[in-house]
Each structure stands twice: as C-alpha cells, then as structure tokens.
C-alpha cells in the first residue's frame, strides 16, 4: 500500500493528527486516519482534539492515543488569559516526540496556529492547507481547494498532496461491542426488544440556528409511528433534558426516553440499530452516514450542504433556501426561515426512505395476513 511519499513522510512513525472542532468533525477524520495507517504500517497515531470532539475517538479504530485540549485559537472568548496553558500544550506535544503532524481544518480555518505550536514542540513535518501565507510555520502546505468541497474530501486532498494513496474515501466507524450491549440493555429496560425495529429521533443540536423546532419533529415522528407501528427512541445529551417539554406528551406511549442516558458510543449503537433516523445537521448525521442507516436530515442554512451532507447513507436532506444562507451563526435572528418545513414533508421523506428499503411493504404484508 505504501507508495512514494514526499520528503521524509515515508519514515514517519509517530503521527499527530490535529482536529480541534466538534464530534462530527472528528468523525469525518476517519478516512484520513485509515489512509495514514494503510500507507504507514506500524505507525502510532495520536489525535489532538477538543474535549467534546475527543468523545468520537472510541469509534475510530485507527487512533492509538487521544489528547484532549481546549486551545486558544478555537476559543469563543471563554478561556481566560493564561499563556502558561498554551506553553503547557507545546511541552505536552514535545514529550510526544512526534515525527509529523497532519493539521485538519475546515475551509474557513487556518492551520497556522496549530502549526506554530507543533513547530515549537519540535515536530519536523507539519502538513496543512490554507488560503493565506503562513511563512515557514508549515513544512508542507497543500494547495487551497474550492470552498464547497466536502469536508471528507478536503481532508483527503491534504494527504494526497504528499503522495498518500487513498483506497477508500467512504466514512466509517466501528461501534464497540460494549456499547452495543449497553444500548441493548437500555432498550430492553424500556420494553423495546433488542433487534426489533424502531425509529430514532435526535431532535437537538448544540446551536439554536441548527435546531429544527422540537414540536414539529415530535409531530413528524408521531405520524411515522402511526404508519409503521414502531416506537421512537429519542436521544440527546444531558443538557437537552430541559428541552424535552411537550415532546414525550406528543409521542405518547410510543416515545422511548433515552435523553441524557448515553455516551457517544452508545448513541452510535442505537443509530446502527435504527430503521430510520430523524436529525438535524449535527453529529448524528455523520454517524448515520458512517453506518449506512437511512436518515431524514433537517439541514439549516448555517452551512453549505455540499461541505457536510451524507455521502454514503440513503437520506433526504430538507432545507429552505434563504437570502441569508450560509450564515455560520449560532443564533438565528430571523425566526429560522431555513427551517420553514412542515412536519408532513418530514413524514413524506421518511416514508419514501422506508419504502425504498421495503419496510412499508413488509408491514403491509403482515397487516394483510392478520386480516385474513
């Protein structure tokens, strides 16, 4: 698998891969991590991620070690003035004795801050891609690519610039067996037989501007329950509990409350077992794509869909074009016009996906048999 790599990259054995964003961003590093392992057999990969993003590491079997860090250049103004904190990061990286660093960023981020930290830590090979000039901070700089390129492809273009071969460009994760067992126990404790069909609803996102109204999600999920006869497993973080008001009342006895009951590996196991997932453009969207589970994605106008949408799973991506998109905002001042999507449209999208999979046909057949 190993080909002719630029410079000393072919001899690199201790690699630092930097992705300092959210869970979904880290999930999308999978194809790069896999390609690095395939091209450099026996290499050791440390993932430098944010504390939140590091939660995805158990799903990425190519990661040998995880370093979780809140860095100043990704901060939203919440970190105190503390230069010693950044110097501690440099010293931590220095102790890692890394041969090379691969710095992954989105189209609007710079790799140069991370590159400078790696330079100060004595990492000789430092790869990144940027539109702006960064002096000698990076030892290897990939040419800029179009903004609209999908993030997975953007990541892969970076290492392909150095001659790394990429055999598989698809997103994938590995669900730990322990997480599958825990997910099964959670379902069974709520009267859902493990292995039986269910819908999964993950109705929230970390940003208000990316959250489809919960009452509409509840109405859509309720209708899909009526059509399929399946329960709706509702997932979310512990912080989402305060947002459940009215949701389970609307779902009735078909709603299965797992909000705040799972970590990310267990959420992935629940996504893996679902017949259909309803979600926003958040980490659950990337999980369903990696696991090839059909999903209806309510995609807000905060981002360009070409950069983030599922590429492998069967899906329906619903959004309304608006003059203000993409806004990259956390809070929407315009009443979420990009989410002006009635629940009926969500239901129609879900039923069309189930029909493609033959699920509705199977249910109708069972109903006919019961009437006979």
Feature annotation, model-predicted:
Residues 1-372:
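Catalytic machinery of carbohydrate-active enzymes
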